[in-house]
């Protein structure tokens, strides 16, 4: 069997598994968020934080709760990192102490579900910070995204009310009923596949074949690895992330990790369909995600299997930066889905990809990570795209656009349009400023188009809350830690505020009855329209800078 055939079968097996869990997992998440019963542990949590689970929140109150919780989380994680040298289970190397700028960047990164890492995990963060700080944020940052998605869906489903649910209920339920049990199952599977789980510090020293001494780091990796993927977080316990054999030792664990980072995001459209009372609507959103993901994955595997140069031509593919235990095709699947979602974990070196392969990782993020996107964020981003598509279709036929019985008035389209302007502005302004400052250009290890691609990738990853990197850029500087931290904050919370405002606007409306002029939003034509609008929006926005970066490199 050729490696290409094996890679196609690898991808198909993932598609079959995701299709198999789509209905049961989507229905389960619907029951979680629609249930009126509270677990005992949940009631204890409500009392501890002083939340009334029976109280509903309008969009403003919901947004303030999201921002307040996230701000407290950033402060806690920031302080925990700076104090870790005085806490148990810390690393003994004084050189690993965090600077305030790096601690800020890391705290923001994990709270925003980005998991951008400007440090080497195994030599910087102690086990207590990994468990009580980073792993906890892997759970709750994902739960925040899911909560916002549920609030937006309620805005579409409800009528004549300004209430979107209760953030604290959504947050705790998402963490305890969905993410925690699934991550336990995932961790057990990963441990059985060879991922390590221990409390060993840097006290294991072995002799290498050359006679030198080498320190082998350990830690509670499997438990963090499971939620890292499941919550589309992506921050690695080790610097090499999922390319490290302690995090991802075999092809089987590689398959499991790709499945984990995709399963919730691909199942949420089913939850959406159940909540709005039309499973066909959920199926249409899923179809858009599947079409875009299939196109992207096909191109990624094609570009990585056809590389120029003596060695790649002899080997038959681009093997630089690829772990041989996975191979080019399986690594391409991982790279594609980690950038289509907001995960950002890597099992290969994206900076070593072909110019067009690297272009695909950039393009996937610039799509807004909607196919399927991050847990929660992918769904609400796709639904905003659906709103824009309905508006464009309404302009074409001269009718007032409606989506799920809700009219799209000037207020709604302004919010939706602003939503899709935020991230491109963050990415393009950040890249332009970095390229304009001579001191920041010194951090580029490559010149020319690839150097531009590295800077563009950094701000694209931060602004879209992905976290992966073209690692040929020195970003552990005060300027980059601060600038990328701001990009992550604005890229996460400005869209959330706009989405919640849009949800509140929809929730206050009544339901408009369908008429002969209503655009059907559950048919293949609508799937094609949303797909086209998504691709056109990205092409118009980012094509000029992509032409200067990866496209120019590919032509050269």
Curated annotation (Swiss-Prot):
It comes from Mycobacterium sp. (strain JLS). It comes from the Bacteria. It is a multi-pass membrane protein. The keyword Iron-sulfur does not apply. One of its GO terms (cellular component) is plasma membrane. This is Potassium-transporting ATPase potassium-binding subunit. NCBIfam families: kdpA (TIGR00680). GO terms for molecular function: P-type potassium transmembrane transporter activity; potassium ion binding. It is found in: Cell membrane. Belongs to the KdpA family.
